[in-house]
Design a protein with these regions (language model features):
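C-terminal region signature
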Residues: 96-158
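Conserved kinase catalytic-core helix
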Residues: 29-54
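Conserved small/polar residues in nucleotide/adenosyl-binding loops
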Residues: 1-5, 156-162
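Catalytic activation segment of kinase domains across protein kinase-like and atypical kinase folds
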Residues: 59-99
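Glycine- and acidic
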Residues: 18-30
Length: 166
C-alpha cells in the first residue's frame, strides 16, 4: 500500500525566543550582531513575500540551533497592501502640541526602532545593519513591488515552531 499526502507539509522546529537568546550572558558581540542582522533579513524577506508581520517585537521571533531567525507570531499578519505606510507628521508651529491623526491601518516605520528590539545597543545595531526598514519609502517600495506581482517567497524565515528556551 502506498500513501500520498498532497499539498500539506508541516515543519516543527525547536527554537529559543529571540528576546531570551539576546539576553544570554555568554553571547558574544558578534553573535548578537549576527542575530540582529538575521532579524532584519527576516523582516525584509517576509515583506517581500507580500506579508506585513504586524507585531514585530523581537519576542515574536525565534532563533534556531543553526542561528537562523524565524518569525512565528501570525496573529497580526496581513497583506502589504492592507497597510498605509506613512511618515510621522511634523508641525512648523513651535507652540503646537504633538498630535497625530491615525487611521486603523496606518503604520509609521520611523517608530519601529522603539519596539522591534528593546535595548539601546541592539536598536543601534539594527539601524546600522538595516536602516531601510525604519523608512516609509522602503515599505512603500515593497508595496509597489508586490502589487506588480514581484513577490519573493522564501521559507527560511517562516515556520510553525515549538517554543522552547534551549
Amino acid at each position: 500500500r502506498q500513501m500520498c499526502i498532497r499539498d500539506s507539509l508541516y515543519i516543527e522546529r525547536k527554537m529559543t525566543p529571540l528576546n531570551l537568546y539576546l539576553d544570554r550572558k555568554d553571547l558574544t558581540e558578534e553573535e548578537m550582531r549576527q542575530a540582529i542582522d538575521d532579524l532584519g533579513n527576516c523582516i525584509k524577506q517576509i515583506a517581500s513575500a507580500n506579508i506585513f508581520p504586524g507585531d514585530m517585537l523581537h519576542k515574536n521571533f525565534g532563533i534556531t540551533r543553526h542561528h537562523r531567525v524565524i518569525f512565528y507570531d501570525y496573529d497580526e499578519i496581513c497583506y502589504m497592501n492592507e497597510r498605509n505606510f506613512r511618515k510621522l507628521p511634523t508641525s512648523d508651529d513651535p507652540y503646537a502640541m504633538d498630535t497625530l491623526s491615525v487611521a486603523p491601518d496606518d503604520v509609521f516605520p520611523e517608530q519601529f526602532e522603539h519596539f522591534i528590539v528593546g535595548k539601546r545597543h541592539l536598536k543601534q545595531m539594527l539601524k546600522e545593519l538595516h536602516p531601510e526598514i525604519m523608512t516609509c519609502e522602503y515599505w512603500q517600495q515593497v508595496q509597489r513591488d508586490t502589487s506588480k506581482g514581484d513577490i519573493s517567497v522564501s521559507y527560511t524565515h517562516l515556520t510553525l515552531p515549538t517554543r522552547s528556551s534551549v
